């Protein structure tokens, strides 16, 4: 079992199929949040992809870049997560407008590998993201925490989402708070 994945998918943001969706359904579906993808991104997981030639393992980060990058004849059979990632310290945080099970303003999944944090977000942009640049800034131990967080905030790789759930400035405020939480709870 992968505790971070279990925790993240418990509160999937899809009102139409609550408690009935598979991990593959969440990731391959049309909803933009795809929260089930976050733990797979931070754990450098692989997707087992099938097509007419057989099965192959593809890094999750390679088949999901802003959107799912599968050919028409391909489908995901399963995911491979190295055991070492299932035992690392982790943090899951979800901020919603009103309810525990709702579309996220931001969902965060983070793990601490060695003394480096890896983190992925849903609801921050129009698609789930893992930004190595944001991680590098947050992991820059030579800088004070406040400066690391400010540089990480400036490194969000795309426009911050603005929709009926919340404004871009509010999401940025939440992101800053969540980065402080990552720093304090995972000790970076």
Regions found by a protein language model. Name each.
Residues 1-188:
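C-terminal structural segment of proteins
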């Amino acid at each position: 079992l992968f505790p971070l994945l279990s925790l993240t998918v418990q509160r999937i943001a899809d009102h139409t199929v609550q408690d009935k969706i598979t991990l593959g359904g969440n990731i391959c579906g049309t909803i933009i949040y795809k929260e089930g993808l976050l733990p797979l991104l931070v754990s450098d997981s692989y997707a087992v992809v099938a097509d007419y030639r057989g099965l192959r393992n593809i890094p999750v980060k390679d088949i999901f870049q802003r959107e799912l990058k599968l050919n028409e004849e391909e489908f995901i059979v399963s995911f491979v997560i190295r055991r070492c990632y299932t035992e690392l310290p982790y943090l899951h945080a979800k901020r919603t407008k009103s309810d525990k099970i709702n579309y996220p303003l931001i969902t965060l999944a983070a793990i601490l590998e060695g003394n480096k944090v890896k983190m992925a977000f849903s609801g921050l942009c129009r698609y789930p993201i893992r930004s190595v640049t944001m991680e590098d800034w947050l992991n820059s131990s030579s800088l004070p925490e406040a400066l690391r967080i400010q540089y990480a905030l400036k490194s969000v790789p795309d426009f911050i989402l603005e929709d009926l759930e919340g404004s871009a400035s509010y999401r940025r405020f939440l992101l800053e708070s969540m980065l402080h939480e990552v720093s304090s709870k995972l000790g970076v």
